[in-house]
Amino acid sequence: MALLQIAEPGQSASPHQHKLAVGIDLGTTNSLIATVRSGQVDILLDEKERPLLPSVVHFEQDNVIVGYEAAELASQSPQNTIVSVKRLIGRSLADVQQRYPSLPYQFEASENGLPLIRTSKGTLSPVEISAEILKKLTALAEKRLAGELSGAVITVPAYFDDAQRQSTKDAAKLAGINVLRLLNEPTAAAIAYGLDSGQEGVIAVYDLGGGTFDISILRLSKGVFEVLATGGDTALGGDDFDHQLMDWIVAQSGIAPQNAQQQRQLTELATQIKIALTDKLETSISYQGWQGNISREQFNQLIQGLVKRSLLACRRALKDADVSADEVCEVVMVGGSTRVPFVREQVAAFFQKEPLTSIDPDKVVALGAGIQADILVGNKPDADMLLLDVIPLSLGIETMGGLVEKIIPRNTTIPVARAQEFTTFKDGQTAMSVHVVQGEREMVADCRSLARFSLRGIPAMAAGAAHVRVTYQVDADGLLSVTAMEKSTGVQSSIQVKPSYGLSDDEITNMLKASMLNAKEDIQARLLAEQRVEAQRVLESVGSALSADQDLLNDEELSAVKNAIISLQRLQKEGDTQEIKQGIKQLDLATQEFASRRMDKSIRQALAGKAIDDVMKNAK
């Protein structure tokens, strides 16, 4: 709940003073900004009463142009006009060039391998370019609202990874924005529809924008928005529809673009055709002297594979949520690309119900963000609403033998913090390496490495005596922090996980499929690895004991122990799970008398020089 302000006597506390906060939908194609005024959320319009701001930035030597004017300059100066920068943010240059080989920009790599774009204004990063869009939006808001903003909620695709989310925050910081929270776009849409219609039950949020696709399965119950599962593709959207049209036009006309300017003109033509076919069954095309026609049915055939990709992600999300399509009460359509009739038809057929389109799909995310910003800034009590997002893949830690110990399972609601204790493996161990991994498999080699760090300064003790508490914390923005602390000394080390680039939906799906297909083999591999680790622990323990007290054994006994050691060493490398288990048992039998004598020796040393009465008193 919002905190009341307490003022000095004689001064007004102004407990109900309205703070200015906005929700920003930082989109791939267009961006919007919304706020709550007089209890109603609405989109802030620009000076020409337009709700959308094209996410396009044009750079000149002494000037930066954002929005419609920048978009008009795209054909004339494609290398200085950055379109769909959201696709680049938080990715490595290698990833960008692999995913988008036909971009007209002049790239170079930063020191850490991130993309930089050469423009007339200098070399700029996607973060700096995104900041220009955010500056334009906040300037518009402060002019319209006649005041300074207290903060903003900025939306991001549900599948943005830590690096992409952090880069979005960095862009906001450059733009001088106080980020109240990063909010998943489907969750923002759920806020908008949940408040407006008061729905309860399972809802699917189908979000197809210019550059990204997200599907979220949510349960709405008594004001609680719980995300049961998420899916999607960070490289699927309306831009891809345009590319299909562009390829078709080139194939039909036999005229390929010869330079960046012609490429940009072709892109603009494809977008115009797509929009025209939303309302018309057929439209004409004029391209570099070539005249032609294309029907909506032909367009549907071109994009059929892309729409099918989105529906496959829907099917996987339903399976993850453990619900069937007929359990979904409502389907919320988000993103400008859901205006395409074929998309609406296919989604309706898949879920067997007409999707909700009562809120403008271009505006719904910004409206939800605006509502959330109003709550977070303290203008509205939030006791009647709770948001629970989830993580898409399990987060774990590497343990001895290359095994994965899962700390936070997949589809756990966030924010969340989980902790687990680990012990040292060797005598005198003073450091521990922490390897953070992501995935569903049992072995580290089959999972995705996120980060590594070391905890040093652990007191030298016997193996297993030092206790290290490892805490995984995922905040409301989906950023992961890992802390390791040795309990007796309090010495600790931590890291914030920021992968250099993220996972696509296909990669996540492949990881999940692999975990199911290899479940039996993975368990067998884990059991074998665990026995090998246990064998190593026993061998080191016996070796340490022999170094200290070998004189307690006669030659025959020592020979038997050494033979059992040699046998276990061989089995550890070559044997199966049961053979190693049997080898450990044989070594245990061979050392039982040795262990008994060591215990007797230890007791004698402890009692040396002490009277019986003193020992009995201490025992009491």
From Swiss-Prot:
One GO term under biological process is: iron-sulfur cluster assembly
For this protein, the record's SUPFAM superfamilies field holds: Actin-like ATPase domain, Heat shock protein 70kD (HSP70), C-terminal subdomain, Heat shock protein 70kD (HSP70), peptide-binding domain
Key words, A-Z: ATP-binding, Chaperone, Nucleotide-binding
| Single annotated GO MF | ATP hydrolysis activity
HAMAP family (UniProt xref): HscA
Q: What does this protein do?
A: Chaperone involved in the maturation of iron-sulfur cluster-containing proteins. Has a low intrinsic ATPase activity which is markedly stimulated by HscB.
* Similarity section: Belongs to the heat shock protein 70 family.
Name by which UniProt lists this protein? Chaperone protein HscA homolog
